[in-house]
Amino acid sequence: MGIHRKSTSIDIEQIKELSKLEGEFLEAKNQRDEELKRVIRGEDQRLLLVIGPCSSDNEDAVLDYAHRLSKLQEEVKDKIFIVMRVYTAKPRTNGEGYKGLMHQPDTSKLPDLINGIAAVRHLHYRVITETGLTTADEMLYSANYPLVEDLVSYHAIGARSVEDQEHRFVASGIDMPTGMKNPTSGNLTVMFNGIYATQNKQNFIYRDAEVYTDGNPLAHAILRGANTEKGGYEPNYYYDILLKTIKQYEQFGLENPFIVIDTNHDNSGKNYLEQIRIVRQTLINRDWNESIRKYVRGFMIESYLEDGRQDSPEVYGKSITDPCLGWEKTEALIREIHQTL
């Protein structure tokens, strides 16, 4: 019984010296961060695409993917702004299974979170410095935010965390775009309350001190579908649901309204191939309705080198968590989006 210490106290400033961005790399990241902020504020009309593996389990495969994605970003940069998913901590429904690079930097060995922190920073650093892309990650543990805040450009608050007050309050101190998912129940009021709390100033105890925040006006919505009590799936990217969501967005009076459609999870019913159809249908809905076009300006897509998923890391570039689109389909889909816009 109880919580038992496994390591000495973590020195955040010492951790930040690992894989630290400097010089031209820091300047390039800052420039892309400003572009991303303009996209969220509606000052840049490019479509936001947050795309990449469900979980970043293999550094070589993730970098391989990142180099391919970087070349494609250059090709479509006039209409699409890409942020790569480099998700390093994974929520587990029942607490079991692979929990991400943060927990297990080597999938063949036992959890090692201290080395996991170093591995996470190293991976984000390599993607940024070797490809010129900037990265997205889920803030699964609110206490870990300071460990990566200088590297991650887009933060996501997951479906299981969006109701949590500490996640909301910590997110209110983030000065980068922060997407907040609807909860697994599909209750959009919960999500909008989360965005409201995140956009406002907050006071709370964080780590070992009383803190206050300035509020995060770049917090926005991610629609990921819902899971029913009977284990079914309820998508929330349909035309009529989007109109209701937009109406609720307006009623809350939030700053910088912006909706990202998560094409996997409960929207796809875990059928990764459905992501292609969901993107196509959403683009049609944007063309059909000006309000949808104004609000729905981003996609979150799970994609890797190989189609599908596997239980253990045997096939290079194939997900060991949720199934993903392979690179061929990913490349074709991004080009299709670019041509359609």
Where are these regions (language model features)?
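Internal helix-turn-beta structural module
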Residues: S303-L341
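N- or domain-start disorder-to-order transition segments that initiate the globular core
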Residues: M1-R41
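Conserved, mostly hydrophobic/aromatic
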Residues: G52, I261, G326
